[in-house]
Amino acid sequence: GVVQHIGTWVRALQRSPWVFTFTQEWPLGSQAHQLSYSIPFQRASRYSGFGDAAINYRYQLVAADARVAFAPRLSLLIPTGSESRGLGNGNLGAQLNLPVSATLGSSVVSHWNAGVTAIPDVTTYTIGGSVIWLASPVFNIVCEALWLGQTNGERALVVNPGVRWAHNFASGLQIVPGVAYGIGVGPSRGEQSAFFYLSFEHRFQAESGRE
């Protein structure tokens, strides 16, 4: 199996808030079953601290190497952030994501996701999509769009053009950095953000016959 360690950092360029999230994903018996956790550390308008954590289970329902792949994910949201400081919601929540990936050609793939997050008093719906040009085996150009709507009337729409590249090592370790620039459109017009991504992926167990 493969273990993945992911760090992301997002900052709104017009304001001081930012969020760093660390995610670690492990196989459960096979690569088809994945268990992960996400822990955010963030700065709100006045305070900094840990936000609400998440425990996630993902099932690869349709194989990742198929032309169309499907891996639904269910998450439990844990109120580890301070609600009074604006760092958390103060309640348990649940989240469902339905991501689909499709190979559109020899060098173009697309990812789509529909999600719903439920906590007391508000439900959030998300729809996202991206197109990725595999410019080379280790360099990709990405354009992503994400829409968010809440039952309290909040709306957001952001387009994220960016790039990512890979460093592959003989040991099986793969390091993937990425950067993107968020552009708010529609209800988010005028907003801008910076996004940084870094992942480390390696085998969970040594190959047979190796230490």
Residue ranges and their predicted role:
Residues 1-211:
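Transmembrane beta-barrel domains of Gram-negative outer membranes and organellar outer membranes
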